[in-house]
């Protein structure tokens, strides 16, 4: 019962993170229901600026190799179990993404827009465009896996800290968790902004990325992570 109760406490502590994600997901699902794929892509990707081009171009790269370097940081403090948690979450999420990608073989926006010669696909200079396996977005999954892992570990430490927990500390914690969610969501949106993915690709990628850390944490908390106080 202690194990199940602890998981419930962690999820309850991250209720703001989870609820806001579900609200965002519901809004995006509503957009997917209301607009055709190409029309929604143009709607989501209609305002480009030089600053945004540079920001999303480089921020999107974080989900490639930098995220894995950051996940190695706990090794400095000899907390290899935290790196194992990040690694198992990213690997499991990546496996799910690759299985789905190769089941659907969905074309990327640059290929789909060839069928719409009257529409100009928004592109960012210097970004190498990909053409296949669009669904779901692997980068988005990576972003959400990483920041959800951070949120789960932050919640665990919050629950087991010696500092007094009250409404004020909970509000500060919840705001911190929303910053993590915003960083994940920005990563997902960057894939739409760069026209590497459609909104549906990003939506499903976020679902995979949000879910896998919870599953891995549930399965490995006692055996691998050894986070019992």
Map each language-model feature to its residues.
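Hydrophobic alpha-helical transmembrane segments
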Residues: 59-79, 139-149, 154
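Interfacial segments of alpha-helical transmembrane regions
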Residues: 16-17, 71-99, 177
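Membrane-interface helix-boundary motifs at transmembrane edges
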Residues: 8-11, 74-87, 158-168
């Amino acid at each position: 019962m202690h194990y199940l109760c602890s998981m419930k406490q962690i999820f309850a502590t991250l209720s703001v993170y989870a609820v806001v994600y579900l609200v965002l997901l519901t809004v995006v699902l509503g957009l997917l229901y209301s607009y055709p794929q190409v029309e929604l892509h143009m709607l989501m990707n209609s305002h480009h600026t030089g600053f945004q081009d540079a920001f999303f171009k480089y921020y999107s790269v974080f989900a490639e190799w930098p995220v894995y370097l950051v996940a190695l940081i706990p090794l400095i403090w000899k907390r290899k179990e935290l790196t194992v948690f990040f690694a198992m979450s990213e690997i499991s999420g990546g496996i799910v993404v690759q299985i789905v990608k190769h089941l659907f073989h969905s074309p990327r926006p640059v290929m789909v827009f060839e069928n719409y010669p009257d529409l100009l696909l928004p592109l960012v200079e210097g970004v190498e465009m990909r053409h296949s396996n669009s669904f779901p977005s692997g980068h988005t999954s990576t972003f959400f896996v990483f920041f959800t892992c951070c949120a789960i570990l932050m919640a665990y430490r919050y629950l087991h800290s010696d500092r007094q927990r009250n409404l004020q500390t909970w509000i500060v914690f919840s705001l911190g968790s929303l910053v993590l969610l915003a960083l994940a969501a920005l990563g997902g949106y960057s894939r739409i902004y760069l026209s590497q993915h459609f909104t549906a690709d990003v939506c499903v990628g976020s679902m995979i990325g949000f879910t896998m850390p919870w599953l891995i944490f549930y399965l490995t908390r006692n055996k691998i992570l050894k986070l019992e106080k």
